[in-house]
């Protein structure tokens, strides 16, 4: 399987070609090159998955871990070194399929969505870089290689979020995303260094005796790594960048939310899962609590947002919370429940990638039709965009957890694992699942039903998107319909052994009833007209509604801390010290040198008489000095 290195190198080659020679190409040619390369990458990924899983398990009954390519990149000292390579195991192969599929759909979709945009070639170059970075992250053979590509993912997202660099909001959003995730990544880097020092390796599978000897340092290292993952996955309170990241092109949002960018934290915990479960189970507990709180917070905020992309952004945050909860509850004393949590998390990552990409690309078609992100500019669009309407409905039903769509299977496995861990956790996550169904159908009815905005529609009649934009919708909708029937546990599990999925009928019945009730409530409130019931509720609970709309003022807290504390109390005194003390000292040296030069410039005047005076004065001074000393 040595050919797998091409899966990483082809997007890199596409980035270099489009980045260096793209401006000499026509936009259509640049798009064709980027899309063709991704099609080859996707085919190679599918063949890799087929070859890997069809080869079967080893004698121990697990899928083997393969490293078809590896090279020592940086020797550090002794046995410690950093390798670059390709690692194939069930979760990395699964992620290759996810990344290549979503990225290919985004590339095809962008041919229509970005047509006529300035910087079209640059856009496709950045997409190729982003794809290469995500692939490098998931096939990394060690934690340091993962960190290198982790940072490349951050750089790529910065470039794509700030693609419209003449737009102030996009520039600010790209800087915000970059800075917030850099703070979290500092914790990740410190954790990696602690881990490497005490474990004696950056490998994902170090020697057991080194970990035992390290004592409490390994849980500390893993906890710091989780901080980095929480930042990348937009967990509260490091979530503030993801909402503003919607300033980038909509296909970029699909790639960020559906592929590896925001699920990188989930993948990190899954990749290091044997270490978490063996040496830091308390960190996994905190992972579950942080995930549950984030899922609830984001679901409440999504219920009152009016921007279609921001509703989907908070939906992503909430769903990532579900994935982290599933990993966190895998510490259950019941081995079956523990394995179920891990498998359910990875299964939900897979299914979520497909229907969330479908939702964002569908949102792009809607924005393309009405030229607005606001739901107030929409309503009644099912008459004008039947294909987008149908595929968007499929995605909404999937994320709500309605049978037989993929979200039903993955979400119910998470809920089953939560109930096995703790009944309280199970009921909390069931309630959040109900909120998910409510806000998604609030969004659905606000876009496709309700009263039309005839004033806007008269000025610009909505229409269905071109074929390059609707084909990816149809493909992703088809995958969303059938993905739930994949025997996922046969391929991906916490220990590599086959895991047979058994639907808990009682949990499934409860979750379906909760989802159906939430959808019925959203239908009653939003389906027929412009939400008079919702307006009355918002007026009755105006304080809560305002707080949720303002995201419970967490952004304002950050604003206060940065401007009133960091800038006013720390940055301003440091700036004063730098300006008056450091610069003052340097200016004093310059003034002293200028003054000395002014005093002695006559020594080089060219006048022999002056030279004689200086000579006699110097001789007299030396004579007096000698007499004083003697």
What are these regions (language model features)?
Residues 8-23, 104-105, 230, 234, ...:
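N-terminal signal-anchor/start-transfer transmembrane helix
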Residues 1-9, 25-32, 80-98, 136-149, ...:
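Membrane-entry segments of alpha-helical transmembrane domains in multi-pass membrane proteins
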Residues 76-87, 489-506, 527-630:
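Aromatic-capped, Gly/Pro-kinked transmembrane alpha-helices
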Residues 45-46, 356-358, 434-443, 515-535:
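Hydrophobic alpha-helical membrane-embedded segments
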